[in-house]
Amino acid sequence: MKWKVLQLKTQEIKVNNLAKSSLHQPGSLVLRNRIRNNQTISNHQKVYITNLHKDKLKLNNLLRLMKSTNRHMPFRNLVLATGQELALLHNKRKRRKTLPLALFYSHLILL
């Protein structure tokens, strides 16, 4: 299954690296390469996409795709969050020592 909406500009994928360095999340480089090669994104991987608020049409298209393909694609765990909310989630996970954040939120989109 391909995530066809991910034909995004490199600017948005580069910010992925910024999110990775601030939250110490591994595997970002592999994920960026997968996106570039338009490969499948599996359930346990996280996707950071930013600057979507600047392009309302792109965001609406993504949400529409999520709703229409929810049963066929791993979008059930997609979360729209700001950087601050993501940091809070990360800290909560550290305190409670629960499962990795990636297992709860497969795809994170930073607005």
From Swiss-Prot:
Protein name: Uncharacterized protein YGR151C
Record's keyword terms, sorted: Cytoplasm, Nucleus
Keyword Nucleus recorded: yes
Main location: cytoplasm
Annotated organism of origin: Saccharomyces cerevisiae (strain ATCC 204508 / S288c)
Highest taxon listed in the record's lineage: Eukaryota
GO cellular component: cytoplasm; nucleus
Places the protein is found: Cytoplasm; Nucleus
